[in-house]
Amino acid sequence: MEKRELIYEGKAKKLFSTDDENLLISEFKDDLTAFNGEKKSSEVGKGALNNKISTELFKLLEKSGIQTHFVKMLDDNHLLHKKTKVILIEVIVRNIATGSLSKNLGIKDGTVLPFTLVEFDYKNDALGDPKLNDQHALILGLVEYQDELDKLRRMARQINDILKPYFAQKGLNLVDFKLEFGKDSSGNIILIDEISPDNCRFWDIESGEKMDKDRFRQGLGGLRVAYEQVLSRILAK
């Protein structure tokens, strides 16, 4: 598979065209950003760890019946995947209150929610990724039909129902996570982007230790070791 022109560069990945018009290559970067790009750094090896973690989790979800853009991991930092039309909605799934949920609503940090919360954010850096309700999404034309929003919620809950017990078996609480979706060439809504400690919060069940990008956000240090631990637990059968 030939890697061709750079199409887009985001905070964590570069996107390249290939010699197949239906396939793209994502290059996972070592860059770190937080607070909508206000805090920046890098961590050698972070991109490769996220690529490997995402690969394993995409495989798990595919086996469980979730359609994703995943094709295969090409090397440490490169992932081959289907080309999609990105839906500009970030789907946030929350099992335990922390971060903005605790800050904005006054829910005590670490509170286990009585049911899984699914929220929508507008994927728009210039606006700071504001919260969306269904009417906002439809007015903005981010989707065409209410049924598509319903499907995003349904898929997000299905993914949570797979990943939450999976990580519990690995000694990790899946606190919350962000998902992105796109439409494939047939118009099917599928999971895209990545699933990694960059966009998931993992807390060790026994110690409560944070094993995700909060180590960078909160200046805790030890980010690479935490990501390596997450990958090690995933690979342990």
UniProtKB/Swiss-Prot annotation:
Family from the record: Belongs to the SAICAR synthetase family.
Organism: Sulfurimonas denitrificans (strain ATCC 33889 / DSM 1251) (Thiomicrospira denitrificans (strain ATCC 33889 / DSM 1251))
GO molecular function annotations of the record: ATP binding; phosphoribosylaminoimidazolesuccinocarboxamide synthase activity
InterPro entries: SAICAR_synt/ADE2_N, SAICAR_synt_PurC, SAICAR_synth, SAICAR_synthetase, SAICAR_synthetase_CS
Official protein name in the record: Phosphoribosylaminoimidazole-succinocarboxamide synthase
EC number in record: 6.3.2.6
GO annotation terms (biological process): 'de novo' IMP biosynthetic process; cobalamin biosynthetic process
SUPFAM superfamilies recorded: SAICAR synthase-like
Reactions catalysed: 5-amino-1-(5-phospho-D-ribosyl)imidazole-4-carboxylate + L-aspartate + ATP = (2S)-2-[5-amino-1-(5-phospho-beta-D-ribosyl)imidazole-4-carboxamido]succinate + ADP + phosphate + 2 H(+)
Pfam families in the cross-refs: SAICAR_synt
Superkingdom of this protein's organism: Bacteria
Pathway as given in its UniProt record: Purine metabolism; IMP biosynthesis via de novo pathway; 5-amino-1-(5-phospho-D-ribosyl)imidazole-4-carboxamide from 5-amino-1-(5-phospho-D-ribosyl)imidazole-4-carboxylate: step 1/2
HAMAP family: SAICAR_synth (MF_00137)
Keywords on record: ATP-binding, Ligase, Nucleotide-binding, Purine biosynthesis
